[in-house]
Amino acid sequence: MQNPVASLLFILAMLTGPCPAADYPERTERTQSAGNHVWHIDPDKGNDGNPGTAPSTAWKSMAPANRLIMARGDTLVIHPGEHAVSLALMGEGSKQAPVTIRFMPGRHIFKHGALMTGKPQISNTNDAPNEPKAMAIRLMEAKNIRLEGKPGATDILLEGKAIFVCMEHAENVSLNGLGFDYLHPTMGEFLVTEVEGDTMKATIPDGTLYTVKDGNLTWHGPGWEFRMGGYSKVFDSASGTFQGRFDPGKTVIRELSPGKISITFKEGSPTMKPGQSYQNRNTRRDCCGFFQYRSKNILWNNCHIYYMHGMGVVSQFCENIMFSHLKIAPRPRSLRTNSSWADNLHFSGCRGKIIVKDCVLGASHDDAVNVHGTHLRIIDRPAPNKITVRFMHPQTFGFDAFAAGDRIDYVSCNTLVPYASNTVSGVKQLNEKEIELTLQHPNPGNIQPDDVVENVTWTPSVHISNTVCRHIPTRGFLLTTRKPVLVERCRFEKTGMPAILVEDDASGWYESGVVRNMTISRNTFIQCGEAVIQIVPHAPRPEGDVHRNITITGNTFDLKNGTAIRIRHTGDVKAEKNTFTKDGKKIPEEKAVDIR
């Protein structure tokens, strides 16, 4: 059962913002469709005064569609062009006759300025909790919905910073054959084309907006700007790795012509080579690419994400999610080398099945896949059967992390070992970071300062297969869940850090999850950061095993240094039938595997 107060607060937050209320009416102000209708939107030739029932009488904007509650068999055909209004969809189809939103081939540009805004509280992203976030497409309390386009031909483009698709309390939703991109990426980039003496010449990708003044370069786009510098990476396309460095503070930048710059070093010599790309971003996590919240049965099929801002596809308290044939990579033949600020696919507090198959992930500044729960610290015990808990990480808070009926584990902050369980019977949100939980049974008597709880009802099984992970300076997959995990037949290419990392902590990111059943089988690891597979929970004073029952079998490791597997505080480990090479020569397992 969902927390009704928290859900209402979330809905109200999603309705706040400067967007015109008439374009985004509430459910009670909408008209119920009888079903089996076809409507058309044509931003170039339409008129919102038209009936919208044929291409020749199409609406101009999404506003008339936003005044409907759609029903089984309804189809909304959206023709390409510039969309000034978000699509805010409510309705319910059936499994046999879903509501279909068909984006016709071409460029669908969602303009900056009048899009629907809200204040969703997003895990690992909440640097700006009170700033309205724009949304191009919003699905709310929608069921049996199909979003579709033509693969390789239908592109949804954002002019300014926004969430592409935000869905909350939705069910049976599929996204098929769609491409997603930014007109003006929030990641500043340039490609070095020439180095001579103390000067580099570089080309800035099309669509990347910038100004040069007084020897400095500023990246900008609709509603945002930042001066070059701060967090950055240098990507070497020839090797597919991140290497090198660049400090713009020691340079003078001049514009030679539109998209062409020179960079002269005031001291020292150029630190980049021709063919290398500089990637530069603001570190403020104020938005994400896609947000899926309290929704279930979500399918992504044959989609391509060319660029998204901030954290990537965030699934928060969702159930049963599948990504099939998803590609996250820059547009072919583009000079861009980055597709995502942070994680590609981020799962926080989900349950059911997470399936990722036949995908290409990467081109990000953080992990390809991250699956975790959240540890909340116990800060008070106001009654024998009550506890007050607090979100501890500054980028994760504000959402309803518990509901009546959820099972919780009490976890030692020092050992990370669960020592008691209970069931939630009531939830009271005290403020954006603190929650009072009423429990069915009294608290255990051995709670220690800084101990935490985890919502173990919301823990998913994970199956990742036939997926390529590349062009990432950090990790490939972070996986912490007690339900079964299977990673098989995947290919990891030159991740900067471990290709697969299993942690669990109650002092840093507070990302929770003991592992109870994990198999890593028949994967290929090429020149990844080491240890390539690292299973090391962050237990300050370990006592016993945090994780257990892990099998690593039949994998192939091409090593840079020699450490393929490092495991700590984990029981029932099997590492067998794996192949290890370094510099083309086989090395024995005892040298490549470190289990203690």
Curated annotation (Swiss-Prot):
Gene3D superfamilies: Single-stranded right-handed beta-helix, Pectin lyase-like. Its EC number is 3.2.1.n1, 3.2.1.22. Residues 23-57 are annotated as: Disordered. Pfam families: Beta-barrel_GLAA-B_II, Beta_helix. InterPro entries: Beta-barrel_GLAA-B_II, Beta_helix, Pectin_lyas_fold, Pectin_lyase_fold/virulence. PbH1 repeats lie at residues 351-373, 482-504, 515-537, 547-569. It comes from the Bacteria. It catalyses: Hydrolysis of terminal, non-reducing branched (1->3)-alpha-D-galactosidic residues, producing free D-galactose; Hydrolysis of terminal, non-reducing alpha-D-galactose residues in alpha-D-galactosides, including galactose oligosaccharides, galactomannans and galactolipids. Residues 1-21 form the signal peptide. Keywords: Glycosidase, Hydrolase, Repeat, Signal. GO terms for molecular function: alpha-galactosidase activity. The keyword Protein biosynthesis does not apply. It is an enzyme of class 3 (hydrolase). Alpha-galactosidase that specifically removes branched alpha-1,3-linked galactose residues present in blood group B antigens. Has no activity toward linear alpha-1,3-linked galactose residues. Belongs to the glycosyl hydrolase 110 family. A subfamily. This is Alpha-1,3-galactosidase A. It comes from Akkermansia muciniphila (strain ATCC BAA-835 / DSM 22959 / JCM 33894 / BCRC 81048 / CCUG 64013 / CIP 107961 / Muc). The lineage of its organism: Bacteria, Pseudomonadati, Verrucomicrobiota, Verrucomicrobiia, Verrucomicrobiales.
